[in-house]
């Protein structure tokens, strides 16, 4: 049967079987709808995606043709259980098609279903209603255009993305199944070639949806490389192109059939798309003829020809995408990019002549239509985006890159936009665009047919630009058109040249045809990193060379030009065509790569897309399978951030369809491109190679099917793949861990706020050994399901039956049945895997998976006592848990290092388990992913499920923090949880031990770990991690397991309703979460901009006995985001344990318990406000920190409550809390004294997780560890830790992510494309490099950098790295301020003018005025004076609260807050509860806050009282004094070494300093002068000195 028939039949079968979604024509919609109905807005869980789940199984079955039979059993079973009946009719067709050698390319359409028609219908039906929720529509097609109900439902929460993993399903579940089977076949060149004979336009439902929902006005024509074209390029490209072509064929056919039949209805359903639908129908009708017809003819035939078109050119670059076949990736409407940039296509036809800003000129030298095209698009952008990039190469088409970045001269862009706007106003683009749409669609059909060949060829374009750029002939490629462009003979010559390069093109005569050359790098969202992965981003099944959404990743967040990509082809008249790239400049990098790898890249991009789309699962699995996994892991560290960003972009591309999704991915995307070209090239090339060779599918955000080796365990793959697919689909909306072609794993949070978590097992599997990965993926998928099932069973057993019902009656049944039998098998397996004891959870997952396998294999065993599974889990758990956690870590982003650490830890615990660990880790990751899915899907019931899961994990007896982190990430924020895997990685970095080995049984008894739910509140992911004593982990593993489960459930519940299933077990998580948070923050930091879902920093210390965790952070997250409200309720009940256990879990757990129990109990209630309750407890501080950092959610995972936290915390901390909230964490204040220190450490840990992650990922973990140890011991340590966290937090919101991204930040000029690789040209992430000077940065960056430096720097050892400007207190790196007292001449002048009393205070870091502003400086000055007067306590609090808010608002705050805090703490040590961390920071207000933390309190006290005369100073006093002096921090060690005490200091002369200490003369003079001034006025000077501190 031809694919069209198959798809049509599948559609019908799916439609018939899909009763839930009458609107949706395809089963995928039905499944999505049913999943939506079942799962509500969050289809992350299997229960929500019940049908999809079966479909996923089918996918897996299809992928594993050998496994299809067993698959069919499972399908049957799943159809029975999951109600997945959609697949059967299609499956028969699939098998037949497979046997017939028909390859289904739908897998390649990972995000976008291969059936453009179906997708369009679905998208239309879903999109038309959901058009208002633009985000939904893109998501819909990503997810295969689930039914509109689901789309709309999902739109708010990570829209249909969850389905995305089952994107094939979304397109058509049946299609998806075909795809799974087809993927392998599609990779076979022979099959694909045969299949590609008809190459209709391939329009992914996503694209269609984008068109309909977003009304994309740009026609994103992605023409697959024609098979014949591909023949020259390479077999793999052939595969990709064939697949793409086949997909196009199928899609076109489906579209034709659907458009003609049900398609019209679906098209009509997409309200705005209705004209497009008619056009599409016309195109489809004319699709066959279009190739032969000139655009004018087509237009005439279609009847949509505009006057300009009739006159002349088929230069339709951007059409309103309403009718265009390729729905825009982006959600309807520009989710993120302001001004509807790109909503209307920018149709700049000719770039040959400079754009004149005044005229409505069409930029169309050759095309008269261009005016119309551009003219109607006044909304195109905000005048920044379009610019004419002059190219020196006359022959090469001039490409104009419209990027939101004003990389290209903004004026020109504005002019272009102006001209565009004028043209838009003058010309009614809607009619013309509709005509264009018809024409272009026809043309595109022709061109795609023609250009399928041409695209690959264009890559070979003599001009390097074109080489990689996908040459898409947007304009109808007809000699008539070029003839119309008479003067454009040059252009046609160029076109001809390009086409000559494209000579392979079937229609050489069409050389006259204009080709829009879209460099994939330019087109794809991700440029550098995503040159290949542009396909991945597009991979949602978008085979289009032009990626549908052009996402401008601005600081604002993803800005999809996406609805419209502007492709300007050189005009036949010879004018160079403009390439308006709504895609972020990152695309340019791709262009370079493409040029470099012209032939391959041209093919590769197509393949990248095709395979990225189709290979997403393969990529994961194959990467896992291939030895690349190790390299991938290695690459992960280097490329992880870029790929995370890439994947985030991809997720964004997929999630951009969701309204919220774009934000996170955008940053990630550009970050990805931000990676240097070389990095991208290396990665992309490696990815391309891997894809070309391995045909690794780029990780689709939701892997519809993990394509494990076909030969691999079919049952597991089927079950696991299915589960993975379902889970991934479910999770797709949530954190999506995308495995880059490089094998890097990315967890991308969908902006919708639902964390998109690709199952770690799958995604992370790539990192692990291929063989293990396959098995692990399978096992892990099964284990995930099994664990979920077992957890459900346990829950049922443990009175969690209700929870199971919540989760999914179907899942519960399936899992229960499977669990029984599988648990037995898994018991044996677990016993067998005793080496893999870490697989306890993993095996639980395996049990689930294998049970699923066994369901087909032996359902009889399902009835075995659940007790066996539980017992087995418990038995195996202790060892396996750690291993799985390690595995998870390994699979996590930067997990190699973490893996080594965790593996070492786990090996130390269970060396024999090391081998099992890799698999188990992956499995655990999968479990975690499943947990997240469950969490997301079953937020209400998730707690029970998670609890059971966690119980199982904890039963494993090993730290399964990863599950918690994931639960946290699931807790609510796409951005908030940048990546569950990132969190896991961070957690693993913090230590496998942190994972509180929570035995499944011990409920919340152990206070060892508190879990901070990571939520993106505001822009920054506020992932406060919990701190748990690793010792306590071991001690109370069972309790922690329970707690952890509860915590996860609570976190998830917190996301929904923080209701810990085990009320006591809210605090299962330990430092690993912290690490995770830091990782996530780093990852999410940029992404988090849009979603400030401060996940409640559930810095709930687990009280040892009650195990009551205050989901403080959850409650606080309430302020930040969805989680917040629920958490509060839970925390109050847990109040006693509310305090986070300081991360130094071993010590602090007890103190933390004490601390927690007292304030915490109240805290929980306040949690909702923020972690204020926490603040009342020492704990609050994590929230409080977040909140005070409200500007930077990082601190405040509680940020949502960061402000709230400030207010709430302040009461507990009295005066300090305000200042703390402003800067530090009130929670410390709440704790007060040692306890507060402990909680401080906790806070610090959390903060570190965020802030450190920003400054340094390792630091965050180490800080947490340090805090853990020190928090118990010293308040100062805690304080410093806290400070670190605080600084890191403020950075975390902005810089943290950038820190992750920063290596990638580049600006490239490639082929006239200016590629800016970051939202900011060079983000503040630079603070990462201590030697760089903040002053080098622009004010914003400077402020953020200073925040980072001050907070993180001070916290860590600001003294060592940072020096405070004496005047404004701005923290500068020593390298810069090394010999200077002031950061700027202005400060020096101010200091001279105000030297009298405030000078010293200003000199200290207290005044952040430099950045903050005069007011803030005045506040600082007043604070300094107050400090000097010892009025600090009374005055400091209000002032701090005042100044911090100001400072908090600005990045400068951290410096301010530190000084203020220091001042506060100085006046009264009691203030420490306020900011015990602050107190530490204050002492070290100078950069050496950490170093001086011990002495600082004294010094501040001394300051408060008059500091003793200099002559009585000790060496430490002198060192602190010197440390305070700007530019002298570097010499503190010299003073200490020289043993210069107060008396010696008085005797010092400049020559002594210069000669003996090797100081520069300037600092020596300053020191001497300072000493002289202090000698003259001892108290003021001393006050000044203390102020400095």
Swiss-Prot record:
| Domain (SAM) ranges | 1513-1577
Q: Which residues carry this modification: Phosphothreonine?
A: 1148
According to the UniProt record, where is the region Disordered?
A: 1-85, 107-174, 252-290, 1112-1244, 1260-1294
Please note every region of biased composition (Low complexity).
Answer: 18-28, 60-80, 119-139, 272-285, 1157-1180, 1230-1244, 1260-1290
Please give the tissue specificity annotation from the record for this chain.
Salivary glands.
Could you tell me which PROSITE patterns the record lists for this protein?
Answer: SAM_DOMAIN, ZF_FCS
Q: Where is the composition biased (Gly residues)?
A: 260-271
Give one Pfam hit by family name.
Answer: SAM_1
Q: What is its main location?
A: nucleus
Its BP terms in the Gene Ontology are: anterior/posterior axis specification; central nervous system neuron development; follicle cell of egg chamber stalk formation; germarium-derived female germ-line cyst encapsulation; heterochromatin formation; mitotic sister chromatid segregation; negative regulation of DNA-templated transcription; regulation of transcription by RNA polymerase II
Q: Is Membrane among this UniProt entry's keywords?
A: no
Q: Which residues carry this modification: Phosphoserine?
A: 1145
Biased composition range(s): Basic and acidic residues: 1-15
* Domain of life of the native organism: Eukaryota
Drop me one GO molecular function for this one. DNA binding
Listed binding positions for Zn(2+) are 1365, 1368, 1383, 1387
Q: Which UniProt keywords apply?
A: Developmental protein, DNA-binding, Metal-binding, Nucleus, Phosphoprotein, Zinc, Zinc-finger
Q: What is the effect of changing residue 1545 to A?
A: Little effect on Scm-binding activity
GO CC terms of this entry: nucleolus; nucleus; polytene chromosome; PRC1 complex
Q: Where are the zinc fingers (FCS-type)?
A: 1356-1389
Q: Give the compositionally biased regions (Polar residues).
A: 154-174, 1189-1221
Where is it localised? Nucleus
Quaternary structure and interacting proteins, as annotated:
Component of PRC1 complex, which contains many PcG proteins like Pc, ph, Scm, Psc, Sce and also chromatin-remodeling proteins such as histone deacetylases. This complex is distinct from the Esc/E(z) complex, at least composed of esc, E(z), Su(z)12, HDAC1/Rpd3 and Caf1-55. The 2 complexes however cooperate and interact together during the first 3 hours of development to establish PcG silencing. Interacts with the SAM domain of Scm via its SAM domain in vitro. Interacts with Trl in vivo and with corto in vitro.
Role noted for this protein: Polycomb group (PcG) protein. PcG proteins act by forming multiprotein complexes, which are required to maintain the transcriptionally repressive state of homeotic genes throughout development. PcG proteins are not required to initiate repression, but to maintain it during later stages of development. Component of the PcG multiprotein PRC1 complex, a complex that acts via chromatin remodeling and modification of histones; it mediates monoubiquitination of histone H2A 'Lys-118', rendering chromatin heritably changed in its expressibility.
Entry protein name:
Polyhomeotic-proximal chromatin protein
Q: Which organism is it from?
A: Drosophila melanogaster
Q: What is the lineage of its organism?
A: Eukaryota, Metazoa, Ecdysozoa, Arthropoda, Hexapoda
Write the gene name. ph-p
